[in-house]
Design a protein with these regions (language model features):
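Juxtamembrane intracellular "pre-TM" segments in multi-pass secondary transporters
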Residues: 196-230
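C-terminal ends and interior cores of transmembrane alpha-helices
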Residues: 86-101, 298-311
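Helix-to-loop junctions at the C-terminal end of transmembrane segments
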Residues: 65-76, 163, 275-289, 373
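Short amphipathic helix-loop junctions that connect adjacent transmembrane helices
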Residues: 21-47, 244-261
């Protein structure tokens, strides 16, 4: 059963990884043709539009993911996962068409569709929570991270090549999105015929378009969870300052091409897969999630700051493994802690709340980064380190006040 969930998530994240090398060059390269001529000389306008486009997905996910999470508690994981994948497939098709037609509005609509239906990962996490005992959750959630890493090994590499006309003459910036849509369609078939229904006891949870806002309010009314939700919020803001605008940093400082970005993110994905698939599984046998998190957060903050040191692109290859492995430890263990502090019947709802918080945390950085990166290209990465460090401080304050055993 875990193997099927792993393969489903891997194919989904392969599609996500494919588009990583495309967005920044699409907006920052004046020759891409996606922006009108009068925008080409205004770097602030181009970077702000890039930031706004990136933020559309998580903002739409903020509204959609908790609805899908609640629906999965009511109707089962499988049906809602299929619905989510159909929306993702449509989103990719619209985005490819938007690039081909040089239509900004189509690009924004496509990301909104994909974001609103983008509950794939939270539903997969709920499925794993359904079949895992508390001691196995961090290890099994690490499988999601390993699938994430493997998707990011192959995805960016494939995306960089599919957008490069020097590889094949008819390749354009649209090609990776057509390919991602085809992959998602294959995933729909896989889930339909191979994904088992894991939810045994269905509950009548409330479904509303305002669930995202209610989730934020509800998160801070949960004594056992509110501090961990705050930690996750700042961790998400911090890491997304890095992931969403690191491409801009690479283009401006090291003159990276789409292919270069794809290759480097494939390298990052290799280390993420190693961190979550190997290091997390070993660490979870010897340490509790809160012990791992207390070390991985400060390690992540320090390694993000260290990214500003290299003045040669090859030097990034030394620093990035520390970023990837520390993030690989942080993600599954923070999710495991939140899951362990929740009842088995509320896993879908609580992980949906967690997804709302992460979506909000993902929506904030690109808009701010689009502005501050025009002041200095290092600022988004510096902000990434600061927010992760803040999350670590809050977590330490939380853990030091919880002497009793609350994490199973």
């Amino acid at each position: 059963m875990l193997a099927t969930i792993f393969l489903t998530v891997f194919i989904d994240l392969l599609g996500v990884g494919i588009i990583i090398p495309v967005l920044a060059p699409l907006f920052l390269n004046p020759m891409s043709g996606i922006l009108p001529v009068d925008y080409q000389s205004a770097i602030l306008t181009r970077q702000l539009l890039l930031g706004l486009l990136i933020s559309v997905y998580p903002m739409a996910q903020f509204f959609g993911a908790p609805i899908l999470g609640a629906m999965s508690d009511r109707f089962g994981r499988k049906k809602i996962l299929i619905l989510s994948l159909v929306g993702t497939c449509i989103g990719y098709l619209f985005f490819g068409a938007g690039i081909a037609a040089a239509s900004l509005i189509t690009l924004f609509i496509s990301r909104a569709i994909d974001g609103f239906t983008g509950g794939n990962i939270s539903i997969a996490l709920s499925a794993i929570a359904d079949i895992s005992d508390p001691k196995e959750k961090a290890k099994n959630f690490g499988l999601i991270g390993m699938a994430f890493g493997l998707g990011f090994i192959l995805g960016p590499y494939i995306g960089g090549k599919l957008a490069d006309p020097s590889v094949v003459g008819w390749f354009t910036h649209s090609t990776p999105f057509w390919f991602a849509a085809a992959l998602t369609f294959l995933n729909i078939i896989l889930v339909t015929f191979r994904f088992p229904e894991t939810l045994k006891n269905r509950v009548q949870t409330r479904i509303s378009a305002l669930t995202g806002f209610r989730n934020i309010a509800k998160a801070f009314r949960m004594p056992n969870l509110r501090t961990m939700f705050l930690v996750v919020f700042f961790l998400t803001i911090g890491f997304n300052f890095f992931t969403q605008f690191f491409q801009v940093y690479l283009i401006e400082k090291f003159q990276f091409t789409t292919g270069n970005i794809g290759d480097l993110f494939a390298y990052i994905g290799l280390w993420i897969a190693f961190g979550q698939g190997v290091v997390t599984r070993i660490a979870s046998k010897k340490f509790k999630p809160q012990q791992i998190l207390s070390v991985s957060c400060v390690m992540l903050s320090a390694s993000l700051l260290a990214l500003l040191i290299p003045d040669k692109s090859w030097m990034l290859l030394i620093v990035l493994p520390f970023v990837a492995i520390s993030n690989g430890l942080t993600q599954p263990n923070s999710t495991a802690m939140i899951s362990n502090l929740s009842s088995k019947e509320s896993q879908g709802e609580v992980l949906g709340i967690n997804q709302s918080i992460q979506s909000l945390g993902m929506a904030i950085p690109p808009i701010i980064a689009g502005i501050i990166s025009t002041i200095d290209r290092i600022l988004p990465i510096f902000m990434a380190s600061c927010f992760v460090f803040l999350a670590w401080v809050i977590f330490l304050a939380f853990y030091s006040n919880r002497k009793q055993e609350v994490f199973q």
